Every structure is written in structure tokens, then in C-alpha cells.
């Protein structure tokens, strides 16, 4: 999924780790909200385990999303690899100017639950109307790539060691600045990973010591 729009300013908030639920994210928004989307990363344990993830925004009701493992076909659920979930929520109508608190939870503590249920991250992207003026253009590419070296998918050998996203910037003039934010959930021990923009390496190599 890709969203493209023009607005005044964008803000990104997140909590990262590999934490037992519930996991909370608190942040302040200074201006009027125009668009917001929240993402929750969940570790399933295996592609066979099922369960659910829930998101509560500003003391509202919990929005639960069922997780069906390798059989998942929900539009807002991206599951890859050995049960790595990335779940998206439209939170435009729920976040507000001022202080916000989001709480993510899973079925980890339910009786007879098999889903691992630990949470990789809770991330919210907010586009606001900045009264100070100016105009920005945004591309938000949404998905979950299972990057890996030599491996197996069932009995089929596989390799998927790169993913490419293209942003159509032709015709844009007068660019004064640009920013790129990438969320990286998991890797294999000892495997170096890189982030390139127009062939230029723009990130430090991620190692086991940087988690």
C-alpha cells in the first residue's frame, strides 16, 4: 500500500524493543491533525500460530485484529517469514491535538494461546497542518518485506536479500530538504543489513550490538 499527499508537516512517534504486552506509546501533537496511521509489529512464533492484536487510542474502545498466520488475508495485516506481523490502523479520527496515549496488546496471556505475542514496535505517523506555512509532499510506503539470505520456503530454496521502493518525484522543483524514515523489525544473527538511497549508503550497518 502507498499513500501520497501534500500537507504542511509530518511527525513520527514510536516505541521499539521486543516487549511483552501491553506496550504504550505517548506523544504530543502541536497542530491540527490531517492524517494519522499507527502500526504494531507482533512476533507470532511460527507461521502456524494464530491469535489477535488490539489497539486502544486515548482511552477509547480496543480495536482487535485477528491474526491467522500464513493464511492471513486481512488488508491491514502484513505477515511474512516465520510469523512476523506488521498491522496497520487508520487512527486519523482518534489522535488529537495535544497529548495522546496509545496502548497495544495481544493474545499472549490468553488461556490456551500459542501466539508468542511479543511486540516489536508501536509507530504512529501523523500529518499536521502547520500554521507556520510551507508545503511538503509525502510518500508513505506500507508493507512488510521478509529479507533473508539463503533459506527455504517449505521444500523450495529461496533468497530475498533486497527490497526496493520507488518514489515518483519527477517534476518537483525547489526542494529545500528531504527526510526518509524506515522501520526495520528483525534480522538474522550476524547478518549485516544496509539502507541505500539512489545507490548511496545512508545508514550505518546494523549489527547484533545495535538492536
Q: What is each stretch, according to the model?
A:
Residues 1-211:
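Disulfide-rich extracellular domains of secreted proteins
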Amino acid at each position: 500500500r502507498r499513500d501520497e499527499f501534500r500537507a504542511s508537516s509530518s511527525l513520527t512517534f514510536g516505541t521499539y524493543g521486543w516487549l511483552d504486552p501491553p506496550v504504550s506509546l505517548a506523544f504530543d501533537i502541536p497542530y491540527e491533525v490531517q492524517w494519522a496511521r499507527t502500526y504494531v509489529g507482533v512476533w507470532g512464533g511460527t507461521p502456524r500460530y494464530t491469535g489477535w492484536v488490539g489497539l486502544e487510542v486515548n482511552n477509547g474502545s480496543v480495536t482487535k485484529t485477528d491474526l491467522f498466520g500464513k493464511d492471513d488475508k486481512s488488508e491491514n495485516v502484513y505477515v511474512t517469514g516465520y510469523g512476523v506481523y506488521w498491522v496497520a490502523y487508520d487512527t486519523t479520527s482518534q489522535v488529537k491535538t495535544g497529548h495522546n496515549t496509545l496502548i497495544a496488546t495481544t493474545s499472549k496471556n490468553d488461556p490456551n494461546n500459542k501466539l508468542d505475542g511479543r511486540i516489536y514496535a508501536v509507530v504512529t505517523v501523523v500529518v499536521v497542518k502547520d500554521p507556520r506555512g510551507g508545503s511538503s509532499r509525502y510518500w508513505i510506503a506500507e508493507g512488510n518485506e521478509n529479507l533473508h539470505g539463503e533459506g527455504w520456503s517449505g521444500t523450495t530454496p529461496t533468497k530475498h536479500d533486497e527490497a526496493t521502493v520507488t518514489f515518483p518525484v519527477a517534476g518537483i522543483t525547489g526542494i529545500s530538504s528531504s527526510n526518509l524514515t524506515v522501520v526495520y523489525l528483525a534480522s538474522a544473527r550476524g547478518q549485516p543489513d544496509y539502507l541505500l538511497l539512489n545507490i548511496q549508503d545512508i545508514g550505518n550497518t546494523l549489527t547484533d550490538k545495535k538492536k
